[in-house]
């Protein structure tokens, strides 16, 4: 099958834009490869950005501690040096190797072509648990949010956060100094979040509504009010809002990856010491892959990324050296 003339064939296409994927993109640029990232979420950073942006990480080399979002921002800044192509809100449905050796990747939006593929999809594609109320779909991408990618857009707004876990509490605390008013709504009296986070929440100016559940959203084009119902007494209250943020957790799965002909062991892609899968030209790194002695840590993913890139480079360019120059001599 011939590639359409308007479709660029990339050297490396990375599936998954979490921390390992971002570092893979940077390293691919260092090897002078054309790189594309395909990410199913609306922003890069994977679970670090989507689930716990304000949490500190302590086991990344060179950082005594680093906020999850700060680490993501640094990785994005590092990656920018080589200006990779980034495709957001695209989930890869099919991945197949054509007769000419080029990989064809079909997403929910378009078709991509690549000489090699590196899968860095973490625990698999994950999607938010949505608010199950009538008419919610019409408010999505307006003022009903499942992700927070820019805190500043909530400045001076009246914001309601639904949820009781770490992410919901984290987002509430991040919004507290920015928003005009922020209210967190949880169906239980006690939060599931870390005790220290809950203590900080209770000592903040954020309003806490427990045990309440949302039962109705009111508004024409956008949500203007939310109706909350007390879990025990069924008493209803109405809150005026500018924005609603939902964090009921996420559901993750390998999804279509299971259908790509890869060797799968316990929901992970089996690779060898070169990060090669059973399909030549397809590699995997980070939490999505497994091998004997595998440890699932961000730090390990950062080590696996260069191995995958260097071997991918040698795959599509047999004249390339497997062992690269040291970065200190390249810039």
Curated annotation (Swiss-Prot):
Keywords: FAD, Flavoprotein, NADP, Oxidoreductase. Its EC number is 1.18.1.2. One of its GO terms (molecular function) is NADP binding. Coiled coil: none annotated. FAD binds at residues 20, 39, 47, 52, 92, 126, 287, 328. Binds 1 FAD per subunit. The keyword Oxidoreductase applies. It catalyses: 2 reduced [2Fe-2S]-[ferredoxin] + NADP(+) + H(+) = 2 oxidized [2Fe-2S]-[ferredoxin] + NADPH. It is an enzyme of class 1 (oxidoreductase). Its cofactor is FAD. Homodimer. HAMAP family: FENR2. Belongs to the ferredoxin--NADP reductase type 2 family. This is Ferredoxin--NADP reductase 2.
């Amino acid at each position: 099958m011939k590639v359409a003339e308007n479709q660029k064939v990339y050297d490396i296409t990375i599936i998954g834009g979490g921390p390992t994927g971002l570092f893979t993109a940077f390293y691919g640029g260092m090897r002078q490869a054309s790189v594309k990232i395909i990410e199913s979420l609306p922003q890069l950073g994977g679970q670090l950005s989507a689930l716990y942006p304000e949490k500190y990480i302590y086991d990344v080399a060179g950082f005594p501690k680093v906020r999850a979002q700060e680490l993501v921002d640094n990785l994005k800044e590092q990656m920018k040096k080589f200006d990779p192509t980034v495709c957001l809100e695209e989930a890869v449905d099919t991945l197949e190797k054509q007769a000419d050796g080029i990989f064809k990747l079909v997403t929910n939006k378009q078709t991509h072509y690549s000489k090699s593929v590196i899968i860095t999809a973490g625990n698999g594609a994950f999607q938010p648990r949505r608010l199950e109320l009538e008419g919610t779909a019409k408010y999505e991408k307006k003022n009903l949010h499942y992700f927070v990618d820019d805190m500043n857009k909530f400045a001076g707004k009246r914001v309601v956060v639904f949820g009781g876990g770490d992410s919901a509490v984290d987002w509430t605390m991040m919004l507290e100094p920015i928003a005009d008013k922020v209210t967190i709504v949880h169906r239980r009296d006690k939060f599931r979040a870390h005790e220290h986070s809950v203590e900080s929440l209770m000592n903040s100016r954020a309003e806490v509504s427990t045990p309440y559940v949302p039962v109705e959203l009111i508004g024409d084009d956008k949500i203007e009010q939310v109706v909350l119902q007390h879990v025990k007494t069924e008493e209803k209250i109405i809150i005026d809002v500018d924005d609603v943020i939902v964090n009921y957790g996420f559901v993750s799965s390998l999804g279509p990856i299971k259908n790509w002909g890869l060797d799968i062991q316990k929901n992970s892609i089996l690779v060898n010491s070169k990060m090669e899968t059973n399909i030549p030209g397809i590699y995997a790194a980070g939490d999505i892959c497994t091998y004997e002695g595998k440890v699932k840590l961000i730090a390990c993913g950062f080590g696996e990324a260069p191995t995958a890139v260097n071997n991918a480079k040698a795959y599509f360019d047999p004249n390339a050296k497997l062992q690269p120059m040291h970065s200190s001599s390249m810039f």
